[in-house]
Amino acid sequence: MITISDAAQAHFVKLLADQPEGTHIRVFVISPGTAQAECGVSYCPPDAVESDDIELEFNGFNAMVDEKSAPFLEEATIDFVTDQLGSQLTLKAPNAKMRKVSGDAPLVERIEYVIQSEINPQLASHGGNIMLVEITSEGVAVLQFGGGCNGCSQVDITLKDGIEKQLLDMFPGELTGVRDVTDHQHGEHSYA
């Protein structure tokens, strides 16, 4: 469920040494499955352990995860990174904003997951996003661009060389192409 690097485990052991005996760490997601999802790590004293918590054992400590957060912490990683500017704890949870879907889920759910977890985070660097409108009976994913992508002069390249290639590679035999139905209006909001 959660991978904690050796450096992060050593960091937690050091921090927990100054806490009352029996204190663990808690890894959680606030507003899981939403665009506002935020992950965190906190101390978990013995009296804060809930009966439905999932207990993960590590070297010298345990991590508690509440039942509601658990599916959103699948594939999460915690690391402790040190560089010339100092050190910091990093927590990456690719499924925090959207629950990972199974490989046998309907095509529309699997495409939505890829859009929300992989494509939109890339487009967000330019203030953009895409939305799946429908999948046609011919297997074409109909998309609508928003934000900085709306009216962007690079939208055709993004669509054909980026998004379409990625989706066709991920869903061979299920998708035949992608189509943009956005009424592009170039303006100050447009990236380029």
Swiss-Prot record:
Signal peptide: none annotated. The keyword Iron-sulfur applies. One of its GO terms (biological process) is iron-sulfur cluster assembly. Binds 1 [4Fe-4S] cluster per subunit. The cluster is presumably bound at the interface of two monomers. Homodimer. Involved in iron-sulfur cluster biogenesis. Binds a 4Fe-4S cluster, can transfer this cluster to apoproteins, and thereby intervenes in the maturation of Fe/S proteins. Could also act as a scaffold/chaperone for damaged Fe/S proteins. This is Fe/S biogenesis protein NfuA. It comes from Shewanella sp. (strain W3-18-1).
